[in-house]
């Protein structure tokens, strides 16, 4: 099973559409958005040929966002615990770094997916992979928008600059 991971798209429809096109080309089965979609209009592009899950980011205050996402996917509020292909996956935006660390260090999850920092991360702590796909570029960060694809069968993680 292939899992697409995206975060911090902040209403940039061009980036959202590029991410969706990439995920479809890679034939991912599920896409997880780690928060900061922001407005409902930019969520609708994720209504595509994959299952979709999203958590709330610190900029996701638009009250219609849940309704729009729920029309084609699942909106999990601040945290999601998913089981995909036998893998236990925690999804949290990452606003509180201490909570991210606790999720990783607990050893209860195969993957901890997060966003917020707009910086790509893939780290392994015991049996847990901590993954941040990055996000729209911010000052001092990489200049490219990235997404990630995880092969849940092999554990391989790849990043793609869009």
Region locations from a protein language model:
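N-terminal active-site segment of His-dependent metallophosphoesterases
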Residues: 1-45
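Binuclear metal-dependent phosphoesterase catalytic core
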Residues: 77-85, 107-108, 124, 129-162
